[in-house]
Amino acid sequence: QYYKPEMMVGLDYSPYAVDLATNMHKGVQNLNFIQGDAEKLDFAKETFDVVINVESSHCYGTPELFFDEVMRVLKPGGWFSWVDFRPKDKVSELEKMIDLPGWECKRNKVITQDVVRALDNIHDRKMKMIAQHVPRLLRGSFREFSGVKGSKIYNAFSNNEIVYMAKTFQKKI
């Protein structure tokens, strides 16, 4: 909207998520959603000015392949914005994986407590939605998945057992 990009591409492994996103964003010009594998991006070298990855790389089988692929598809001078979480004892492993020689980390921030505050702020609304729209039998699972207060993920963030990070890289020219 502000920068008038020639194209925007959303990629998801799930064809159902692609269909949902396509239907939800029909009116957005130059935006396409495609099904694909983040560890094997089906784009030419140096295609994108910006790659954004939010809360998904922790699900990848081989995240280092994903980071290599981002490096490959980014144009020189391009930006990679990444936000995700890892167990505290896996952060140093992630740092080694993501610290590629072809880009420079421009921003590196732990945002775990910001995430906890956001979860606190939306807690009541999530609980109300779950109570109104989810069958009683499934409510416990939905509370866990949504990260409400008292859930395992909420407690892990609160106790700093899981670290939530935001990083921005620029590919070297």
Predicted regions and their residues:
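Hydrophobic packing within well-folded, soluble alpha/beta domains
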Residues: 8, 33, 48-51, 70
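Conserved Class I S-adenosyl-L-methionine
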Residues: 112-173
